Amino acid sequence: MARIAGVNIPNHKHTEIGLTAIYGIGRSRARKICEATGVPFDKKVKDLTDADLEKLRDEVGKVTVEGDLRRETTMNIKRLMDLGCYRGMRHRKGLPMRGQRTRTNARTRKGPRKAGVALKK
């Protein structure tokens, strides 16, 4: 298995698809990386030479991926929460922040339903 940016790339997949195993690299960015390095994107990962892998490692190193990207995203959300802006408050409350309705739906963001309060008769 090839190892790029601390991630094992599946051997049996094409280079373009295999690179998407790295957090922060999708199909379009993987294709651009392959074009920039001159590595054919439809070549299987197991068929790549050491020189090809080294070129890919260098090109992926120029992009923010994996832990750095996760940390950056977390810090952006934390900054919004510290500012106390609308989006930050919605993050803090665990509600959708892009204007979706919450009277019904929004179950993914709000979590499972809580038991309702029973009224006395």
UniProtKB/Swiss-Prot annotation:
The keyword Protease does not apply. It comes from the Bacteria. GO terms for cellular component: cytosol; small ribosomal subunit. Residues 91-121 are annotated as: Disordered. The keyword tRNA-binding applies. Keywords: Ribonucleoprotein, Ribosomal protein, RNA-binding, rRNA-binding, tRNA-binding. One of its GO terms (biological process) is translation. Pfam families: Ribosomal_S13. GO terms for molecular function: rRNA binding; structural constituent of ribosome; tRNA binding. Belongs to the universal ribosomal protein uS13 family. Part of the 30S ribosomal subunit. Forms a loose heterodimer with protein S19. Forms two bridges to the 50S subunit in the 70S ribosome. Located at the top of the head of the 30S subunit, it contacts several helices of the 16S rRNA. In the 70S ribosome it contacts the 23S rRNA (bridge B1a) and protein L5 of the 50S subunit (bridge B1b), connecting the 2 subunits; these bridges are implicated in subunit movement. Contacts the tRNAs in the A and P-sites. This is Small ribosomal subunit protein uS13. It comes from Cupriavidus metallidurans (strain ATCC 43123 / DSM 2839 / NBRC 102507 / CH34) (Ralstonia metallidurans). The lineage of its organism: Bacteria, Pseudomonadati, Pseudomonadota, Betaproteobacteria, Burkholderiales.
